[in-house]
Design a protein with these regions (language model features):
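Conserved N-terminal catalytic core of the sugar/cofactor nucleotidyltransferase
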Residues: 1-47, 186
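Short coil/turn segments at beta-strand junctions that form active-site/ligand-binding loops
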Residues: 44-45, 71, 152
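Phosphate- and divalent-cation-binding pockets in alpha/beta enzyme and binding domains
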Residues: 3-7, 31, 58-59, 128, ...
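A short acidic, often aromatic-flanked loop/helix-cap motif at beta-alpha or helix-coil junctions
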Residues: 26-30, 81-83, 163-165
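Conserved core of the sugar-phosphate nucleotidyltransferase
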Residues: 6, 56-135
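Active-site acidic Asp-centered loop
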Residues: 49-51
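Conserved beta-strand segments of alpha/beta enzyme cores
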Residues: 18-20, 100, 153-155
Length: 188
C-alpha cells in the first residue's frame, strides 16, 4: 500500500541502487505472483529477497559471485542443518547436488540445505513461474524454482557461517533484533 511505498521511496534515496515498487493486486495468492508483478520493470539480472528475512549483506556478494546460467537463477542456501535460527517446521527445504538445486519445498524429504530467501535471477525466472502456474497450478516461487531445477538452470551457493533469520515468530523477531544490535556494535 501507499505507506510502504513512501517508506521504500525514502529508503531508495539513501541507497546506491534503484528501487521500483511493483503493485501486486494478487498479493493474497502465491508468492510467485509477487515476483511476476516485477516483470514489466526488469530486463536484466535482479534479486528476489524475502521481506521477512534478515541476512548478512555479504550473502548478496556470495550469490552474485559466479555468472548466472542463461535463463536461470541462483539461490543462496544454508548447509547447516543444525542452524539454531531455523524453524524446521516452517523453513523451505532444498535438495542440492553440487552447485545445482534438485528440489525445493517446505515438505520435501532428502533435503540437505535451507532456502535463505536470497536469489540472483535472470528474467528466465518469470517464464519458469508462468510455466509452473500453467502446468501445475503452482503460483509459488518454489514452483518456478522447480521448473528451473528440472532444466538444470537453478544453481545454488553455500553461505558458509553467514547469519540469516526468517522472522516468522516473536522469538525469531527477538533473535533478529539481537543480531542487528550485535552487528551494529561490531561495526562501531
Amino acid at each position: 500500500g501507499q505507506p510502504i511505498q513512501e517508506c521504500v521511496k525514502n529508503l531508495a534515496g539513501k541507497l546506491p541502487c534503484t528501487i521500483t515498487c511493483a503493485d501486486n493486486g494478487d498479493w493474497h495468492l502465491g508468492n510467485g505472483r509477487s515476483v511476476l508483478a516485477a516483470k514489466p520493470y526488469v530486463d536484466g539480472p535482479f534479486h528476489v529477497l524475502m521481506a521477512d528475512h534478515l541476512f548478512d549483506p555479504e550473502i548478496l556478494n556470495i550469490v552474485r559471485k559466479e555468472p548466472l546460467p542463461d535463463h536461470g537463477a541462483r539461490l543462496a542456501v544454508d548447509l547447516r542443518l543444525q542452524n539454531p535460527h531455523v524453524d524446521i517446521d516452517d523453513v523451505t527445504k532444498v535438495h542440492t547436488k553440487g552447485d545445482k538445486i534438485v528440489d525445493i519445498g517446505k515438505g520435501i524429504t532428502g533435503f540437505n540445505a535451507f532456502d535463505t530467501g536470497v536469489f540472483w535471477c535472470t528474467p528466465g525466472l518469470f517464464t519458469a513461474i508462468e510455466d509452473s502456474i500453467e502446468s501445475a497450478g503452482d503460483d509459488s516461487l518454489s514452483g518456478g524454482v522447480r521448473i528451473l531445477a528440472a532444466a538444470e538452470l537453478m544453481g545454488c551457493c553455500d553461505i558458509g557461517d553467514r547469519t540469516w533469520i526468517d522472522v516468522d515468530t516473536p522469538a525469531l523477531l527477538t533473535l533478529a533484533q539481537e543480531a542487528m544490535v550485535e552487528r551494529a556494535t561490531v561495526a562501531v
